[in-house]
């Protein structure tokens, strides 16, 4: 079974929504890293030397490759990444190998079997 890692950088107010949408589209878990920071096309403005930005979260989803594109697009659409600039970004990368996913793999295999019926 092959996996992809979906990485979502989003405003902290969108974290729960992104997780809920991803789970609804087949993600079996997530990892959230809080207080992430990024910079886009335009540098972040500062006031008296202090950077003024909202908190961002990095959300990681290790998902089965056949579901990855659907999850990626669903999260992006629900969080309006293409509609509201600066809201967040989502992308995926290939995973060479992963260990410690036995329970999730069994769950994914059962779901795939149900879909085939």
Tell me the role of every PLM-derived stretch.
Residues 1-117:
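Positively charged, small/polar-rich N-terminal and surface patches that mediate targeting and assembly
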